[in-house]
From Swiss-Prot:
This is Putative N-acetylmannosamine-6-phosphate 2-epimerase. It comes from the Bacteria. Pfam families: NanE (PF04131). The keyword Metal-binding does not apply. Belongs to the NanE family. One of its GO terms (cellular component) is cytosol. Keywords: Carbohydrate metabolism, Isomerase. The gene is nanE. PANTHER family: N-ACETYLMANNOSAMINE-6-PHOSPHATE 2-EPIMERASE-RELATED. It is an enzyme of class 5 (isomerase). The lineage of its organism: Bacteria, Pseudomonadati, Pseudomonadota, Gammaproteobacteria, Enterobacterales.
Length: 235
């Protein structure tokens, strides 16, 4: 029988997220965004918050990668940072839970190893995705028993600031694929169909695209920037 990860091999995952300061922030809107993604051929949805996931699951039957973004004092870790978020997510049964698996200090000084152990003890069947930013973190995630690893946070930590996944023909992605045997999820700044296809060609198991599909304000900004640059060139 195929597992969720088997089903996602070579496919597109669409991230449907809008934070409180964004114009599309609404469980209803995110559920419709997920429906549009499903109709377009997406194989799964990545979503933030219990209310959004519940609404999305009413609209589509696709697997969901669930997260909860929540800030904690004294820690830069905010993606599914503690067991509290895991407990909340499990009330809506996402097929996969993604969490920050970087080496940064976690809330309450907890180690990643301890956190994973808590999750496995309480919810032994849930699939776990490690959101990482470095090669060492990818290797550690595999050692800790994560089911898959994503390049989600590359360029978003102090150690990797200034970098982005597409640079040098996705060099970081290629390095991660070579370093681990668990499925690698390409995620982060995959902003064109060609880049998504390239990630898969380079060995990614599956690819997540978010803002380039589901954040109209970002898409509009890119168009405006290109038009303004063209206008300057012609001036």
């Amino acid at each position: 029988m195929k597992t969720v990860l088997d089903v996602l091999k070579g496919k597109l995952i669409v991230s449907c997220q809008a934070l409180e300061n964004e114009p599309l922030h609404s469980p209803f809107i995110m559920s419709r965004m997920a429906l549009a993604a499903a109709q377009g051929g997406a194989a799964a949805i990545r979503a933030n918050s219990v209310v959004d996931i519940a609404a999305i699951k009413q609209q589509v039957s696709l697997p969901v990668i669930g997260i909860i973004k929540r800030d904690y004092p004294g820690s830069e870790v905010f993606i599914t940072a503690t067991l509290k978020e895991i407990d909340e997510l499990m009330t809506v049964n996402p097929e996969i839970i993604a969490l920050d698996a970087t080496a940064r200090p976690r809330p309450n000084g907890q180690t990643l190893e301890s956190f994973v152990g808590q999750i496995r003890a309480r919810y032994p069947s849930v699939l776990l995705m490690a959101d990482i930013a470095t090669l060492a973190e990818a290797k550690e995630a595999q050692a800790l028993g994560f089911d898959c690893v994503g390049t989600t946070l590359y360029g978003y930590t102090a150690e990797t600031q200034g970098h982005s996944l597409p640079e040098n023909d996705c060099e970081f992605l290629r390095d991660v694929v070579a370093a681990v045997s668990i499925p690698v999820v390409a995620e982060g700044n995959v902003d064109t169909p060609e880049r998504a296809a390239r990630c898969l060609a380079l060995g990614a198991h599956t690819v997540v695209v978010g803002g380039a599909i589901t954040r109209p304000q970002q898409i509009t900004t890119r168009f405006v920037a290109a038009i303004e640059a063209h206008s300057i060139d012609r001036a």
